[in-house]
Amino acid sequence: MNRRPLALLSMLALMQGCNPVDETQPDALVEDPATVEQKVAVSGFAELHHHMFAEEAFSGGWFHGSHTGTMVSCDGGAPESDHARVRMDLSNMLNLCPNSGALDLSGVPVLNSMFGVGGAVASEFIGKIEGTEGDTGLHLGRKQVNTQWPRWDTIAHQQAFEGSLRQAHLGGLSIVTVSLVSNGFLCSALPYQNLKRPCDEMTDVEVQIQMAKDFDARTAWAEIALSPAHARQIIASGKLAMVLSIEVSKLFGTKDWRSELNRFYNLGVRSIQPVHQLDNRFGGAALHNAIFQAAQFLENCHIDTDCGVTGPGFTLGFDVDANCRNVKGLTAEGKALVQELMAKGMLIDLAHMSERTVEDTVALTRGNTYYPVYISHGHFREVMSPDLAANEKTTPASVIRYVRQSGGIFGLRTAHDETRDYTRTPIANSCQGSTRSFAQAYEFGRQGLKVPMAFGADLNGFIQQTRPRFGSYGACSAGFKAEADAQAAQQRVSGPPRLGTDFDQYGLAHVGLLPDLLRDLKQLGANTTGLEGSSETFLRMWERAQSTRTGMADAAADIDTSGVATYVPKATREAQYPQICGKAYAPSSKVLGDTCRFNEECVSAKCTSLDCGNITGSCICDGDNDCGAQQYCGWGLNTGTCQNKKAKGALCSNNNECLSNNCRWTYTCG
């Protein structure tokens, strides 16, 4: 099947680099800035995709921890845990499709684990992404709040606590789009005893709306915004403006969508994602995760062989073309929905749309004098690693051009992923998955795509966040272990230094650390002016949706996608490191107390590991030179640990134990 022009244009733009395809309409007018009413700019930055009330998503059966009250430690997934696990008998779900017996999921680890094993084992697999320990299934080492969770790799524990949101607000957050979320398939995979009610995405949304209203009523520093003017008033009074949005696959269920849209508008919703993880009555979804391909398969039992997205030679559930793109665009209902959203002056979020659905939506909004669209959370395709860039869900420069032309904004995912080097920035991409990687995408967006950006963190979104640059909790770990160790060691030497907050070792663990990510980005050398003022940009987009428009907001003729370095595969990079017992390692990358596998990894050249590194140990001192000037390397019960030298009169056995370097015959320091 042939892809439509938008998809072809995006690929051509990628190949042409600094000469992207010009999609400007010949007769399109660009608005004169002088004709646009200029208001006093609000202060602060925006977060465009925040799941504050996701504890009630999936019928309340997945997350531990409330957005309000006191944060408490969890049971660590010990049976029968009330969170972070799927059922044991998920293989029965496949029986819904008579052709499921022909499926070979052995080459799709996440699905093989999920449907073949289930329970705690599958839950742990879902939560363990390379470079992490995970916090799902049996997670006894991730029980304690504040020390073991939340962390950057948390996907089943609260990251949107109201105290954390208050912390973010005090740090400069002035607008947050609260995404009311659920997913029926994930709900159906959870243990029945953990569900508070029958699985229904829109019911979950209504529960979360009520939670948002309750939060608004009892909170002096935050308020739900119902219009851009209202948001300006809220921010001017020193409060956080919250904008309600909906993100579900079964939008409005099977009910009359017009009456439902009116009802949810009256409940305070002002932003809509027409599609989410699955195709629905309104349009096609972008493919990206095998779990949701399985979910789509369970709805239609379709196995596509035009392209192998799910596994070798096959794609589950979605009808794809030879380029692995969903062929479904906006349906007749979807086109009518977009028209109604524009009539109401609501915000249209393109996130998760298939490329064809984006194309169809753009055609409608362009025809309405460039009605603004935005992407609440996304990745810039051209700067991501090849595996991620291959996902339809990533955003190509051709779509960014239209976001700019429409006067929209892009919510940049604060992701844990590898990025390619962007050579137009002096910020070294020397800590994969950390702020340094985020900086490559941000600078590409700022300098190359020149698109207005805000944060699109997706906290509580079943997804991981920016990794730390320091500490032992997955610093720089988006690549492979040896590289992570080498890069983490480099951060200690080359800096910039730690911020002195939890962000240093836990990464973007919760919403309260967004200001710290911004600070770290700034101290790395990025120009963060636009990001720091992104709330004003968001409000101008919203105002544009409700104002008379005369043409494009921006011709966007200056996009430059060049400057992105060629990606070097992990296997090629790993081959540059020495090996012991067949395992690559970074020489002298570990300091005292760090976890290690081999002596050669430690600066002290001494590691307590066993069995060729299969049983890890710790780096210990092997002599006084490994310790500080006022310390010595201990012996006996203190073997391998640096001890403070002793004052005069203290018991000693050797001269090196004494500050005076003199242990007398009385076994006391002189």
Region locations from a protein language model:
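Secreted, cysteine-rich disulfide-bonded mini-domains of extracellular proteins
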Residues: 582-670
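N-terminal hydrophobic targeting/anchoring segments and the immediately downstream early-domain regions
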Residues: 29-327, 332-339, 343, 358, ...
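Short secondary-structure subsegments characteristic of cysteine-rich extracellular domains
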Residues: 11-12, 201
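C-terminal motif of bacterial Sec signal peptides marking the signal peptidase cleavage site
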Residues: 15-17
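Bacterial N-terminal signal peptides that target proteins for export
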Residues: 1-7
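A short glycine-rich, hydrophobically flanked beta-strand micro-motif that places a catalytic Asp/Glu
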Residues: 353-354
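Bacterial signal peptide processing site
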Residues: 19-21
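Short catalytic-loop micro-motif centered on adjacent basic/acidic residues
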Residues: 347-350
